[in-house]
Swiss-Prot record:
Cofactor binding, note field: Binds 1 zinc ion.
Segments traversing the membrane: none
Gene that encodes it: yacG
Keyword match Metal-binding: yes
InterPro entries: DNA_gyrase_inhibitor_YacG (IPR005584), Znf_NHR/GATA (IPR013088)
Protein name: DNA gyrase inhibitor YacG
Gene3D superfamilies in the cross-refs: Erythroid Transcription Factor GATA-1, subunit A (3.30.50.10)
Swiss-Prot/TrEMBL keywords: Metal-binding, Zinc
Named cofactor requirement(s): Zn(2+)
PANTHER family from the UniProt entry: DNA GYRASE INHIBITOR YACG
Source organism superkingdom: Bacteria
Amino acid sequence: MPLTVNCPICKTPVEWVPQSEFKPFCSERCKMIDLGDWASEKHAIPVKSEFDLDALDELGYDEESFFKE
């Protein structure tokens, strides 16, 4: 008996077999909806910020003088 997973978009059961062309999605439509969600940044991979915002505050710049220099 093959493994069955739910489509991440519509929750339709999908058999995890080589014949399942769009796995883990049930269809091209659900695959494209997911791609659109990534492209519009509805999904994102969390990463640690490169910047320490507290350290930036310690530099002593205020917004007005920073842009005038």
